[in-house]
């Protein structure tokens, strides 16, 4: 951490085909062991599969899925007087999108199926429709925040 001032926030780059930052964020989160070309391959194949399934623009499906999964509020563990409380905190847009992408990928990895392309495309389509594991995770987080609203003053 710098003592001289605040570090500038890096702007997310866009991917070569769709020219979209969300796709690039997705690629960087799906990445394992530095194999970025494989990550791009998985994402682009999943987008093609979404195109075939829904017959709509896959980017709009991705945006809709991420918008549906993005949480407005989350809980953070805070230790006060020897006991740990789950304190609800508001989440910014960038952090919310990052969480949504993480939840979408986690839900797709847990899905039964043949390969990651199939699982990711299915999860994105489900999330865009308002169902699926990632949506359930968001609702669970919101429920937790609502249940612990009494501790909101600990922020």
From Swiss-Prot:
GO terms for molecular function: rRNA binding; structural constituent of ribosome. The keyword Phosphoprotein does not apply. Its main location: plastid. SUPFAM superfamilies: Ribosomal protein S7 (SSF47973). GO terms for cellular component: chloroplast; small ribosomal subunit. It comes from the Eukaryota. Keywords: Chloroplast, Plastid, Ribonucleoprotein, Ribosomal protein, RNA-binding, rRNA-binding. InterPro entries: Ribosomal_uS7 (IPR000235), Ribosomal_uS7_bac/org-type (IPR005717), Ribosomal_uS7_CS (IPR020606), Ribosomal_uS7_dom (IPR023798), Ribosomal_uS7_dom_sf (IPR036823). It is found in: Plastid, Chloroplast. GO terms for biological process: translation. Pfam families: Ribosomal_S7. NCBIfam families: rpsG_bact (TIGR01029). One of the primary rRNA binding proteins, it binds directly to 16S rRNA where it nucleates assembly of the head domain of the 30S subunit. Part of the 30S ribosomal subunit. Belongs to the universal ribosomal protein uS7 family. This is Small ribosomal subunit protein uS7cz/uS7cy. It comes from Morus indica (Mulberry). The gene is rps7-A.
